[in-house]
Amino acid sequence: MKKLILLRNVMILLCFLTVGSNAWAKVRLPNIIGSHMVLQQKSKVKLWGWAAASETITIKTTWDTTTYKAVANNGAHWEAEINTPAAGGSYTITIEGENKIVLEDVLIGEVWVCSGQSNMEWSGDQDLKESINEAPHANQPEIRLFYVSKSTALYPQDNLEGKWVVCSPESMIHFSAIGYFFGKKINSSIKTPVGLINANWGGTPAETWTPAYVIEKDPIIKKGAESLGQYAWWPSNTAIAYNAMIAPLTKFSISGVLWYQGESNVSSYYSYEQL
């Protein structure tokens, strides 16, 4: 009887291992790469993800006839550079290995990150009058929004929570007002699709958004970081917002960054120029 129980347990374990192995073998993408995204125009942009070690990944787009290839390394990571045309779309990207992923409704245009503290975070769901008044007019199919969920980490992460959505009254009302109105202005002025990435957190000091190695190698910045107070309602430890909310974005090609910062660094004004 004991032998039968042992055999059953071994079989169950083998089943779990097989399922787990198959799951890791599948081609996967970080959340920043998905349907409805905007890719930076006229650039070599990186696409990346995970797959079984040594697996060959093929990438095809509908804006040209090139087939791009990448091979997953021993860490199960793959990466490829693809060429993007001038602004336009929508397009489809097909990524295939053991399984196939089809990214639909992809636009090519200008990509901006909206980061910093409270003035950048402010949105319609925080009773901002301008956003509330604008919301009924926010059906903007050429503006795409990616809202990064607030989180912290002790070490740089390779993925984050969030997904690309088409700008609508429902999605815009939760998004950075500064980011939205900036994107709307670009879109209307130069007739170019705009992708906006919302990664901000009210009250946070600049050191929270700065990589640890940058702080450690500069004695003035390090002194300012060590003088920061601790608060229950927002993070203030060095690098922890960067690790969770910015590090996973660093491979994604952008046009620029909208940044609001200052109030939480008043006490360490002497390091602000270096920051």
Could you say what each language-model-derived stretch is?
Residues 24-275:
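Cell-envelope and extracellular/periplasmic
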Residues 1-28:
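Bacterial Sec-dependent N-terminal signal peptides
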